[in-house]
Amino acid sequence: IAEQYNVILLHENEKDIFGDIARRCNVILNEVGSEHFKAIFDFANFVQCDEDPQACYKLLTPHIEYIHIKDAVYEDSVNVLCGTGDGQIESILKQAIDRGYEGFLTLEPHLVVFDSLKDLELEHSTETIQNTVAKDGAEGYKMQYEALLKILSNIEQEENA
């Protein structure tokens, strides 16, 4: 159906599903085997599944159509400001840009607990989100946006050096 209507369906490496780790994402993507079925790459979800985002990126590169900007730390799986965790965001984004990535970057400001997120998280959302980073969702979004701009600026400066 996706091919018939020329749309692209996306699989996200969401925690606690079969396709949460890179190896299983790759199985799903290769089994479907369609140019109309691609991957969303979410740095934090890989970290929270104890995966190495760089290894995940290397395996899934041919399938990545969309990138979620969200970071986390291995130690306790807590979401942190993008670029400050173990997601290797700047390094991997640079690689994506260098290979010609022109897709979307979606900010996921999961720095505070909000009602709709509670409904999405299978585990208790306060285990991965600490309300100490931002006072509310608007501030969390602004912080993530500014952190992403800094990451992109660093990449641009490195390219121009």
Model-derived features: positions:
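Histidine-acidic metal/acid-base catalytic patches
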Residues: 21-41, 47-161
